[in-house]
């Protein structure tokens, strides 16, 4: 599998930062090459050209249409993270969800 570049977003980047750290740990255990950044939702546009996937906090479901507009024709997979793993910061479950797309 090629190196994946992933952006996680939440409201301010704090909770997505913890989740990104846990996904990094889960990926390292599997020897997967994944570059994960966590940012606030206001920064999405700045990263569209650099990422393969965008993982969105479940509380931001209301901006999915806006995100699709940002992405346009870019080849970026958008995943709405599930509350079941987001609320517990379960990096293994989040990684599984991500890998299903690739």
Protein language model regions, located:
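Short acidic/histidine-rich motifs immediately flanking catalytic phosphotransfer sites
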Residues: 48-53
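P-loop/Walker A phosphate-binding loop and immediately adjacent motor/lid segment at beta-alpha junctions
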Residues: 4-5, 9-13, 24, 64-86
